[in-house]
Amino acid sequence: MTSSLPCGQTSLLLQMTERLALSDAHFLRISHLIYPRAGIVLADHKRDMVYNRLVRRLRSLGLTDFGHYLNLLESNQHSGEWQAFINSLTTNLTAFFREAHHFPLLADHARRRSGEYRVWSAAASTGEEPYSIAMTLADTLGTAPGRWKVFASDIDTKVLEKARSGIYRHEELKNLTPQQLQRYFMRGTGPHEGLVRVRQELANYVDFAPLNLLAKQYTVPGPFDAIFCRNVMIYFDQNTQQEILRRFVPLLKPDGLLFAGHSENFSHLERRFTLRGQTVYALSKD
């Protein structure tokens, strides 16, 4: 004996599973809407990515047409849906101690500086980068109050929630040493088996806040000894890259370091940043 869904439920299920049409006009509108708010340049080869990310948002709202969703955005420039739109289109690929060659350079730089050592993680994502910075500084400088601090920001408010929680799957910590895992994380038990959480003693040194690098003004606790802005600039055009680098200059202390992603080159964009190591730049203030 078989049973079937009522007609209305069947219709709704079909709407939720069938592929929605993303026209050239829709894609162009999306590109024009995201660029001024997040600086993201959407080339045509990003179409499938845009579809896959936004279609989930449409379905969560019960919408079946991209045009209706874009009309919803444009009808209210202050709607909270704009943040959900931005969250959907930002990329959050990260890992603990990603681009591992940066962290010995950070440690060496921190040893040679006096006063409170301050670092800004400008694209913190789900927290792996700022916690990697924090572990490096704790190992290098100790945990005396006022010795160091990490400020971590991201445009995506959803990933910041995960970052603040400090909870990760155990397999995500494969790049940590056994000593770091024991010193800085607590293992979950029972229903939390397989999860770990950043110990509060380390988390206290990391402050998270939402921040858009395209904002007219940065509310950050600078100046900093180092800024991590890795694998972010690749999503911006050259004019936006230059503007962000120009705004970093007064936020870095003399001889401060700027850490870039593996495919990013800043030397030709801002003459005050000179290459110090592999994708690491030093600021010289004349």
Spans of model-derived segments:
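Conserved AdoMet
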Residues: 2-120, 261
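Residue-level signal for inorganic ion chemistry
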Residues: 106, 227, 252
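Conserved class I S-adenosyl-L-methionine
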Residues: 116-129, 148-151
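Conserved SAM-binding loop of SAM-dependent methyltransferases across substrates and taxa
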Residues: 126-143
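Extended basic-aromatic, gly/pro-enriched interface segments that bind polyanionic ligands
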Residues: 146-228, 232-240, 265-267
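Core SAM-dependent methyltransferase catalytic element
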Residues: 226, 267-286
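A short glycine-rich, Lys/Arg-flanked "PGG" loop and its adjoining helix->strand segment in the class I
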Residues: 242-254
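Conserved beta-strand signature within the Rossmann-like core of class I S-adenosyl-L-methionine
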Residues: 254-262
